[in-house]
Amino acid sequence: MLASLQLRSYAPTCIMTIKAVFFDAAGTLMKPNRSVGESYAIFAADCGVKVTPSELSERFRLCFGEAPRLAFPGASDESIGGLEREWWKNLVARVFEPWGRFENFDKFFVELFDYFAEPGAWSLYPEVLDTLTELKGRRLPLSVISNFDSRLIKILHGLGVGSCFDQIFVSSRVGYAKPDPQIFHAALNHHNLIPAHVLHVGDSEINDRHGANSAGLRGVLVDRHSPADPNDRHRITNLEPILDLLE
């Protein structure tokens, strides 16, 4: 278990040469082909439960924000798969609380959970493959740090980018979730790097940019929904400007 890792002490440094790049996954590298609310509504309708996608999207945002972190410190590797599934089952049950837990909820949940495990449920953002290929061509170590679960490994390989990464760190297996500095330190320890030499790129201001900065890395926010800010080089609208940040 990575949760038991011993964190190194890092001395402050003014050397800012980038020697590795870490990425978040969902919202940064990939996106669901349908909104969460739409997928939930489709699978629920198959079980006779009619709820609009917009209602489910709003409930999901609320419940996900209130849920405990998807991390299981001290859990054995053998138990994590079951813990992940139970975590998501509890979350989905909370999402549907206003409409009651329907009779065939267990069947519904299995189908929903398995659907989101398939690469076909996801797509890469247009610039991702070219950007990762360019970074690998520069021989930079790349890793993923995500508050996801074990399904992410299959998804990234199915989307054709799994081999771009030296390691894929998911919070459920590391035992810590972003913005906790310890999940960033797990990746730093794996690569034997100090924080100031690493960019971390993600779509969450709190989990990615602030979390990485708090751990001593250089956090970069990817905000695909707002125009670029020429005064903030560490907020980008897609992954292409990462290449300029390496100069």
Residue ranges, per PLM feature:
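Asp-based, Mg2+/Mn2+-dependent phosphohydrolase catalytic module
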Residues: 2-21, 31, 45, 54, ...
